Amino acid sequence: AMGSEPTAAATGAVGVLRRDPMAMKPFCGYHYGDYFRHWLSFDRPGAKLPKIFHVNWFRKDGNGRFLWPGYGENLRVLEWMIARAQGTVPGRETPVGILPGAGELRLDGLDLGRAALDELLAVDPAGWQAEIAAIGEYLEGYAPRLPPALHAEQQRVAAALNPPPLQAAAG
């Protein structure tokens, strides 16, 4: 459930996250629960599903500066996406999906410090727990027509972000 802040071209309060980043919700001709079910129906044996990637080009550091330079440098990330879709790079499994693994992004000639790269590729459990909770609230708005698979995936990610504490060995 992607989210975005409204831009000057969109209606709504600036700085408030909306779960309608493509601004299509008002134009969907049927219930979103049914719409989600329709998309999930494509996942069957032998199906060649599209590869879907999510990118936040606008992440900022603690000083409010963009972590990624953007513009033409975005091609470096697109190259990784293509390599990932073709199966030539494995990526790194995380609770929220597959991220570029060490050395998989072409960084030659890029003025990007190691700390910025580490922050870009980090999964902040607390931040993601809040995001997953917000997604859960969003999805509940489509109950009872929400496909169970979407709720199950939201719960799977939530559990992966909050692993149980390690138990001390008895001895």
Predicted segments — roles?
Residues A1-A169:
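Conserved NTP phosphate-binding and transfer environment spanning the P-loop NTPase/kinase superfamily
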